[in-house]
């Protein structure tokens, strides 16, 4: 196992442990995102488009655009554009709320549900390939540490 310092060919040690941990987190996230993007591209999706479809399938009913945006894994400034592209591909439909015409609901199509069904197994395989070397206790600890690391960020939402 190589350290981040070796991986980055950094001559001097990191200035402080927080810096090393944060750079480790960013490096790991980047490597994971590359692999997930490659998988979703095989199915004609971006990770953000997949995330929207996953949210809609999980909810089981249409959701307002702002509700979808609040549930995204990554902050997305152009969610309307993402939904436009999903609609053009026949993966979602929009419906205006009858009680409040300003609210637009997004519905997942059967075609999208079928597409997600095709993605499910390769995605689970990828989860196992990327983190299967960690035992359940280590995975739990990792999740807890990441949640703790996010705590100061929850009170201060990210701006795009």
Show which residues each predicted segment covers.
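N-terminal leader segment of winged-helix/HTH proteins
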Residues: 1-43
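Pre-recognition alpha-helix immediately N-terminal to the DNA-recognition helix
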Residues: 20, 24, 51-54, 114, ...
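N-terminal helix-turn-helix DNA-binding core of bacterial DNA-binding proteins
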Residues: 26, 30, 34-75, 158-160
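Alpha-helical linker/hinge and terminal dimerization helices associated
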Residues: 32, 72, 115, 119-131, ...
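Residues within helix-turn-helix
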Residues: 65-66, 77, 84, 104
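Charged, amphipathic alpha-helical coiled-coil/dimerization segments
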Residues: 84-144
